Regions:
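A short, surface-exposed loop/turn module that caps and links secondary-structure elements
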Residues: 33-61
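Enriched for short, Lys/Arg-rich terminal
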Residues: 2-4, 10-16, 20-26, 30, ...
């Protein structure tokens, strides 16, 4: 892997909640693997940068209403997984 993976405490909680909701964990694991290898995600994942409170982070869609918020720290080659959940879970919308 090109990047080491760092899970925030909140991401760990979100990941457990995703399992409890019976979401297909293999989908998020595959995306995390691609990101850790420095690969671009397919267009269907709608990967894009965030602004405001999430400036410096990126967001991609695992499914239409299941998101992954992450950021790269290229100085130390770390992929930080910040949050996962629905739009309302993450942004209150």
């Amino acid at each position: 892997m090109k990047y080491q993976i760092a899970w925030t405490a909140q991401f760990k909680k979100d990941y457990k909640l995703a399992m409890k909701r019976h979401l297909d964990i293999e989908l998020i694991d595959a995306i995390i693997k691609k990101l850790a290898n420095g690969e671009e995600l397919p267009e269907q994942n709608r990967d894009h940068g965030l602004s405001g409170n999430w400036n410096g982070h990126r967001e991609c869609h695992i499914t239409p209403d299941w998101l992954l918020v992450y950021r790269y720290d290229d100085d130390v080659l770390v992929l930080t997984l910040a949050r996962t959940g629905s739009h309302s879970d993450l942004f209150g919308k």
